């Protein structure tokens, strides 16, 4: 993204800001290769503020708690880990300049805050800057140069290029020579109390935990993945927090899944559709649509139909506080909110129901979008993510969807209700399970 001749060439720096792992990391491998070619010291640079802009305490704490393991793993391979305790991209750029890098390598992100950090750092540094897409199996810019309309338009583009990019990872060998030595700030835990979230124990952070969860999914759960839309079944992979923070590679998951002959073909196909096509569609949406976090991102048909029904009477209108506390008339919605607050992750099917009901029970689509994004980005370990923003935009504003039968409030945006959920799964079982797990009394 930036090519200049550095006045001094004393190191190669990999600024790790999205893909927080030592294994199966294309940016790390590329930066190491360049350091070896130039016979220069190599360093991995980390900043909690740079890795978590707009994140809540819960998300920062989850990432932070996996850092010691990451640091040890890198140092075991001879890679020097530098922590920069800074708050702004300008401060980070100053730390980078102190290292006099020949090259700065960093991770791809489609989100505005992360892109702003990179833009500012690149502007203030005096070396070439390369951004490596380690999030997507097929790199975002290789797939398309525009916002894709739906999964059906991006799917063939991804499938055509999948074989080209779905290659084995080289192993990370121990770095010999070219040792780096730069000042590193002590790892300091984020401060609690700056928002409503608290740390959760539902998920153990780090690469090792991510690999264990994936292994458990393949051995014990993937056979029932076709029942993933039933929240009473333990059929989900639960990998989204780890994928969000780059503690495991999506490409590694795909490679291992394709090689596994024990996984049923249909379950494998559906899982890979979610992991590759749907996930990369979300990244495409956020990269090419700067309004991904507001109703301006909705397709024209959805904007028109929601405007037409804007003044429709609402039987229930809740405040953000009532939503946050799971204090609505709908016990199913409340359970989904409790799951989010107390476990740090909501079941995938319930995320759709949850967001659509926020539209139904707020005065405007703008309020609905704002509330849903706030709640997801505050409480979900995989919040502040392209998948989350796209999911909210799909639920509330028909992004990547089509018009349905017209009704009050929703217009022709797809509708979901309690009766439909009851037909799909045992609602009472889900509510009871979440109430017990979150220590709630059912009334």
Where are the regions a protein language model picked out?
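Short low-complexity stretches enriched in small and charged residues
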Residues: 1-5, 57-63, 199, 207-210, ...
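Glycine/tryptophan-enriched, flexible segments
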Residues: 140, 146-301, 424-443
